[in-house]
């Protein structure tokens, strides 16, 4: 199934029914069945699935956080004059987090009156809930700050490493936290003792991260193929080498998506192509062979049955994986 939207595709995800939902740079949310919602007066800057699995949560340059379902949009929060450019949600706790500049905000889907705000020294670039949804990681300059999402007055835990951290991801067991940096490298920590893990060797910036296979592997962009780090055991990737899958000299992987419980990864390339791979046998399955504008959004269904993608020129699609 192919689409030709009129704007850049900011994000794509699968809802609880297994249907793709696209967030666009013109402020609209598009559903696989053709439904469209005008969610924002401006561009969507970040979007994730709602904790309920129904529809999409999006932050925009209009300062609004919006929950879009096929029936229409619902405003969750508003920060007039600001850009909401990082959003996270936890199905486990029902909490929603979003940031604008140095301010991080938390809301509760079960309690409309609940509100928390946390200040940072520098701009927050990305957010991620730990698996239980109680702690929240905020990637910023100098490291990642950790907050207990429900506690009002607190000092954050700080995982420190010099440089600008632009994306972050928790391992499914909550033992490790990995960040992408402005440099051509990742940095990770074993959270319990703050043990540092340097993960370098990338030819470009690895901006896209995805744990898969029950947390035993971490897939990243930033190279000519998908870079896969081993995370099994108590020490994660420490002292181990990464593998590279689907290497092509003429293209770079810019987006990755992983099936949480299965060894399947999807890759979006800077030349517009998309493929998926079963890492147990390293069999690459082409999903979009036509070249075009760079892939900007990518998602794989939890059962690894389908992949959805979007590109910077508005081209998008959904494909079945021939397993």
Where are these regions (language model features)?
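WD40-repeat beta-propeller superdomains and closely related acidic/aromatic-rich repeat-like regions
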Residues: 1-323
